[in-house]
Amino acid sequence: MENGFLFLDEMLHGVRWDAKYATWDNFTGKPVDGYEVNRIIGTKAVALALREAQIHAAALGYGLLLWDGYRPKSAVDCFLRWAAQPEDNLTKEKYYPNIERAELITKGYVASQSSHSRGSTIDLTLYHLDTGELVSMGSNFDFMDERSHHTAKGIGNAEAQNRRCLRKIMESSGFQSYRFEWWHYKLIDEPYPDTYFNFAVS
């Protein structure tokens, strides 16, 4: 692991995680290149900011559940290769039912570079501290559809309010949202703004 990075659970006591790209449960339908263990890595700076977000969330009765953090460049390349393959319908219904696989790049859901590779971007949601249940957000992680946009129409008032709650928690902790994905937040003062790393999550 590069200097300045760590497993986020080492600093964020009580955080939950489910590193989707290390599993078969993601839009490619298999573990993604570069993810060798089901843990999440980030910069020390993002860990400190997330610790602040944890405090804000806990005051409202919520905990943080992380889906992705640092993403190796090899994983981004794996996504691009997958997006260029003919449709096999293995994951389409769950992740991108309303657009074609070939459109995922042009619509901004799959990119040739990812801020995740700089180590200070996080994909996450909230869960209820008292029950452990995930907070309803109106769409699932990596659902590549307008329902996942911050300005989505067709989600309930409660789900829209929950998204605003997550956004307020994260923005008050130094993060910037991404309009196409309610779960995606980038640390504004990231320590490596021009470096795209490629060490494995191991």
UniProtKB/Swiss-Prot annotation:
GO biological process terms held by the UniProt record: cell wall organization; proteolysis; response to antibiotic
PANTHER family xrefs: D-ALANYL-D-ALANINE DIPEPTIDASE
Binding site for Zn(2+): 116, 123, 184
Zinc-finger found in the keyword field: no
Keyword Ubl conjugation: no
Active site, UniProt feature: 181
UniProt cross-references to InterPro entries, sorted A to Z: A_A_dipeptidase (IPR000755), Hedgehog_sig/DD-Pept_Zn-bd_sf (IPR009045)
Site keyed Transition state stabilizer: positions: 71
Organism, scientific name: Enterococcus faecalis (strain ATCC 700802 / V583)
Similarity remark: Belongs to the peptidase M15D family.
Function: Catalyzes hydrolysis of the D-alanyl-D-alanine dipeptide.
Gene behind this protein: vanXB
Annotated catalysed reactions: D-alanyl-D-alanine + H2O = 2 D-alanine
Cofactor binding note from Swiss-Prot or TrEMBL: Binds 1 zinc ion per subunit.
Induction (UniProt): By vancomycin, mediated by VanS/VanR.
Alphabetic keyword roster: Antibiotic resistance, Cell wall biogenesis/degradation, Dipeptidase, Hydrolase, Metal-binding, Metalloprotease, Protease, Zinc
Top-tier EC class: hydrolase
SUPFAM superfamilies: Hedgehog/DD-peptidase (SSF55166)
Name of the featured protein: D-alanyl-D-alanine dipeptidase
Listed CDD domains: D-Ala-D-Ala_dipeptidase_VanX
Enzyme Commission (EC) number: 3.4.13.22
Transmembrane intervals: none
The protein's required cofactors: Zn(2+)
Gene Ontology MF annotations: D-Ala-D-Ala dipeptidase activity; metallopeptidase activity; zinc ion binding
